[in-house]
Amino acid sequence: FFSSRSRHTRLLTVTGVQTCALPIFRRAKARGARVTAEATPHHLALTDECLATYDTNFKMNPPLRTEEDRQALIEALRDGTLDCIGTDHAPHTDYEKDKEFDFAPNGILGLETALPVCLEVLVKQNKFKLAHVIDLMTRRAADILKLPAGTLAPGAAADLCLFDPAEKWTYDAKDGFSKSSNSPWTGQTLTGRVRLTAVDGRVVFEDGKILR
């Protein structure tokens, strides 16, 4: 799958890796191939059992898999086979999603729920260190994309996110900041909420309000 040229060519796999590909990535990394891959919050949290009702807000690509697959992705994050967490944020209109399951488009919202979902699945349920999860969602992704972000090092831009890891709140996509509402977490109680966001030192979001 990966030739010797992979050491000189970088490959980034996005939108989540399927479990069957994990051994390939492990072998490639062991050979020194420059390959990186991400996991998504929804593939870490949900399984194909969610599809029983044919709710199109659970339709995505790659599709949801079994509980065994979900656990394999979590362990791949733990051992470094998977390099970072990406939201695969894919908004769609209500009109697009309000179709028969086979005809509705793939994709769900991911930005507003990524943090609480990862805190629940990785930190609370699977005993990841909080600092590790933050690193997977910030610095690791920035490093892969060669972006000067994801760090609080001297001289770095003050791009900050302050959150309360213990705050419980009920998510409703209709009240969210996206123009779309295709989220599988609508109506669910989540734990962990962003309270403030700063971009280059300027506060742009605080206590549920966009300031600029």
Task: Identify the function of each model-found stretch.
Residues 3, 141-142, 186-189:
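Short loop/turn motifs at secondary-structure junctions and domain boundaries
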Residues 57, 78, 83-85, 90-166:
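His/Asp/Glu-enriched, well-ordered alpha-helical/loop segment
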Residues 8-9, 17, 42-43, 89-92:
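Histidine-centered active-site/metal-ligand motif
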Residues 1-20:
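Single conserved hydrophobic/aromatic residue that forms the stacking wall/gate
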Residues 58-68, 107-110, 183-189:
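A short acidic, glycine-rich active-site loop
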Residues 11, 38, 88, 118, ...:
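Residue-level signal for inorganic ion chemistry
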Residues 100-103, 157-209:
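C-terminal cap of metal-dependent C-N hydrolases
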Residues 17-85:
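Histidine/acidic residue-rich metal-binding segments in metalloenzymes
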